[in-house]
């Protein structure tokens, strides 16, 4: 949206801004004063209290944590309130899983206490291991092992003559998002699904099991949501609108994101007892995990399982704590910062490590406010509820306030679980340079160098030792001292509605890689003891997170200059287009090889006659995709971005307040130009044509998703259509940059 102001108004604006920043006087002093307000001890105290009891959605402690957070914000000088939504959140009434043949064994149940972790024995009020938004049911059937339960796994099973129709499948966690596993099982005709944590992923295959080490113990279970998040997140009954008390709701049977089959999670201690009994063909090498057994595929009737799940499907309250510091000169431009406060059980790492870091920022900002400092833009802090079930709290708030957010929000900054290690950032690439500038100013608490310097060193050493897989751009940047690229955003946390539905630029920030939180992820063992023993002793990286995010908030809220550098975004999109072209070329090459193998009957001839594997199914040949318009659009984007960045570098410092305000107005909502109201194929809620969660990756991002996924899934008409639509949004984006450059140059 274009904004303009009269000269007098601009002069008053500038005077007000100068007065507001008088205490402290400059950016470095402001950030130093902010840092002085960050206390790791505060974070430890808050976490210990917030993680002292189960805090899942609807629990008494979840409400108590929200009320305590509200009181803190108000004491620190924020204008704060709780906004409550009534969300569908199923909780378990019955969870039964048992082997009934070749012998009867009752499996599952609550995780046992471990020595040294006091809260692990506090199971009163804790929900048993389960997954949300599965389908209620009571089924008995043969068991089939489907590896990760992803499309290629079902192709491998089909080539071995194994059909899961009418069966219960068991899949291991990993590679793809958990919700895809039962969804694909359901689509292939299975009547039930078990998902287990294999020790190769996060158990003794990666380290000592808890409590000796931080890895997942024998009977640790990963809870989670299995709702079809890649269709839309949020309350399944209120897509596109806030789940207020009086909202119009779908019937549960009509909600497309709720599964129809029963699903339960399982520990590897229990899963091993099932898998050890399976007969049928020996599993191919990619199917083999870390259990001390020979993995078989089953399906021969040797193992039968009884699976029963029944849930309480009533609405539960979700308490979002929303706090504001009103901007002095641009109060209708918002910086939104969020982290959720609900967990699956105690949730010390996920989410409270990020939540207490956010509270530290809020306390430090409140102290600055009381000293007379004022941000130019309004700062909004949100402690979300109900993220774990399917991003309910943030999505319902974003949908409920959609018009206001699209009119006011400049940037959304998200955090979630946090731990020891390297800075990890994903998000809108026009903010990549800002992230790198901030990373150079924050000190790593264990090495004494900047977090940017440590990350560069880790990338270089990882490439040398072949222990990491940095992409070429990251390695080149690390070696030359340039900006480290940030990643793309898929889904899995509270940025999704902001970025992918509303088109608000977003960043997701955390530290990690040297913690051991994966081993207790979504289990009863994600506790204060585990967090402070194995993930971030002393919460030193919690303090580093506060200082990192706080600097970004302060710099964007100051509005003394636009913080975007658009050449980074343009270069990134150009890279994505190269990847899409290579994908199409590689697919055509692969298709040609497959056709020759089929023509020559090579699959049958090469197959072991005693262990026959059928030929790969024939598939349509990948045609040439019409990408000329997208090529031209990327060229226009690169030219416009380069020209804008150059104009700002040459003349930005000389802008008067009126033109600066006009420029802010032109850039505030520029990311919304990357939306297409028609959405992505088959999932219209997702409207962003540059970043989306993958249909078969979930948390993982797909870039240029309308084109890329259409090629991957052989929807070639869609690929051509979305190449054109993506080209249009990039041309519109480039035109806005040209207009912004005109403002800088006085045209």
Question: Across the structure, where does each feature detected by a protein language model lie?
Answer:
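Alpha-helical metal-binding/catalytic segments enriched in His/Glu/Asp
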Residues: 321, 337-391, 396, 549-552
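Metal-dependent peptidase/peptidase-like ectodomains
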Residues: 104, 135, 216-282, 330, ...
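Noncatalytic luminal/extracellular "stalk/propeptide" segments of secretory-pathway proteins
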Residues: 24-29, 36, 48-163, 199, ...
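Gram-negative bacterial Sec-dependent N-terminal signal peptides
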Residues: 2-21
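Second-shell loop/turn segments in exported
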Residues: 30-37, 51-60, 130, 134, ...
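A conserved hydrophobic secondary-structure block that centers on an alpha-helix together
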Residues: 147-213, 328, 332, 344, ...
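C-terminal amphipathic alpha-helical interaction region
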Residues: 656-747
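Soluble metallo-hydrolase cores and metallopeptidase-like ectodomains found primarily
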Residues: 121-156, 232-349, 363, 367-371
């Amino acid at each position: 949206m274009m904004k303009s102001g009269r000269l007098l108004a601009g002069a008053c604006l500038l005077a007000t801004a100068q007065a507001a920043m008088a205490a402290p006087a400059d950016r470095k002093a402001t950030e130093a004063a902010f840092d002085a307000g960050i206390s790791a001890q505060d974070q430890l105290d808050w976490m210990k209290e917030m993680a002292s009891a189960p805090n899942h959605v609807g629990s008494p402690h979840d409400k108590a944590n929200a009320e305590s957070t509200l009181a803190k914000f108000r004491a620190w000088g924020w204008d704060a309130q709780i906004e409550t939504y009534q969300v569908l959140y199923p909780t378990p009434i019955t969870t039964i899983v048992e082997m009934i043949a070749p012998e009867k064994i009752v499996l599952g149940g609550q995780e046992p206490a471990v020595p040294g972790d006091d809260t692990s024995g506090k199971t009163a009020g804790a929900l048993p291991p389960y997954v949300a938004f599965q389908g209620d049911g009571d089924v008995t059937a043969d068991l089939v092992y489907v590896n990760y339960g992803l499309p290629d796994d079902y192709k491998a099973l089909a080539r071995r003559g194994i059909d899961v129709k009418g069966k219960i499948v068991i899949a291991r966690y990993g590679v793809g998002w958990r919700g895809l596993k039962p969804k694909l099982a359901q689509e292939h005709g299975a009547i039930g699904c078990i998902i287990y944590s294999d020790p190769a992923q996060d158990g003794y295959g990666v380290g000592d099991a808890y409590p000796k080490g931080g890895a997942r113990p024998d009977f640790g279970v990963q809870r989670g949501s299995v709702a079809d998040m890649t269709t839309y997140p949020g309350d399944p009954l209120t897509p596109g609108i806030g789940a207020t008390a009086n909202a119009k709701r779908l019937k549960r049977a009509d909600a497309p994101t709720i599964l129809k089959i029963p699903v339960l999670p399982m520990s590897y201690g229990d899963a091993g007892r099932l898998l050890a009994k399976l007969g049928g063909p020996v599993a191919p090498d990619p199917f083999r995990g870390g259990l001390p057994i020979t993995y078989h595929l089953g399906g021969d009737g040797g193992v039968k399982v009884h699976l029963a799940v029944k849930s309480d499907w009533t609405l539960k309250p979700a308490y979002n704590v929303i706090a504001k510091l009103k901007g002095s000169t641009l109060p209708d431009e918002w910086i939104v910062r969020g982290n959720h406060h609900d967990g699956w059980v105690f949730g010390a790492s996920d989410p409270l490590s990020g939540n207490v870091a956010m509270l530290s920022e809020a306390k430090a900002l409140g102290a600055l406010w009381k000293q007379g400092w004022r941000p130019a833009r309004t700062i909004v802090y949100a402690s979300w509820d109900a993220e774990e079930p399917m991003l309910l709290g943030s999505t319902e708030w974003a949908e409920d306030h959609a018009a206001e957010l699209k009119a006011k929000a400049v940037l959304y900054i998200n955090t979630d679980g946090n731990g020891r290690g390297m800075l990890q950032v994903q998000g809108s690439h026009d903010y990549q340079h800002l992230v790198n500038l901030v990373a150079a100013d924050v000190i790593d608490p264990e090495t004494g160098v900047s977090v940017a310097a440590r990350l560069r060193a880790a990338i270089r050493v990882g490439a040398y030792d072949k222990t990491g897989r940095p992409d070429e751009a990251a390695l080149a940047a690390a070696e030359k001292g340039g900006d480290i690229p940030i990643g793309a955003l898929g889904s899995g946390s509270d940025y999704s509605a902001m970025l992918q539905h509303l088109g608000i630029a977003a960043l997701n920030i955390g530290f990690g890689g040297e913690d051991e939180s994966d081993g207790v992820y979504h289990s009863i063992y994600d506790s204060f003891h585990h967090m402070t023993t194995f993930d971030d002793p002393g919460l030193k990286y919690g303090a580093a997170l506060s200082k990192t995010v706080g600097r970004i908030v302060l710099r964007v809220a100051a509005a003394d200059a636009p913080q975007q550098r658009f050449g980074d975004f343009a270069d990134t999109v150009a890279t994505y287009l190269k990847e899409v072209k290579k994908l199409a070329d590689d697919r055509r090459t692969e298709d040609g090889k497959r056709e020759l193998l089929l023509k020559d009957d090579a699959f049958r001839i090469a197959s072991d006659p005693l262990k026959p594997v059928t030929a790969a199914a024939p598939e349509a040949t990948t045609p040439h995709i019409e990408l000329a318009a997208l090529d031209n659009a990327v060229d226009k984007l690169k030219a416009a971005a380069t020209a804008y960045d150059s104009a700002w570098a040459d003349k930005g410092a000389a802008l008067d307040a009126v033109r600066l305000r006009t420029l802010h107005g032109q850039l505030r909502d520029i990311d919304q130009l990357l939306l297409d109201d028609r959405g992505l194929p088959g999932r219209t809620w997702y409207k962003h044509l540059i970043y989306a969660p993958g249909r078969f990756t979930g948390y993982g991002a797909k870039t240029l998703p309308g084109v890329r996924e259409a090629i991957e899934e052989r929807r070639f008409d869609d690929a051509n259509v979305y190449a054109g639509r993506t080209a249009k949004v990039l041309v519109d984006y480039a035109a806005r940059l040209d207009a912004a450059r005109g403002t800088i140059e006085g045209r």
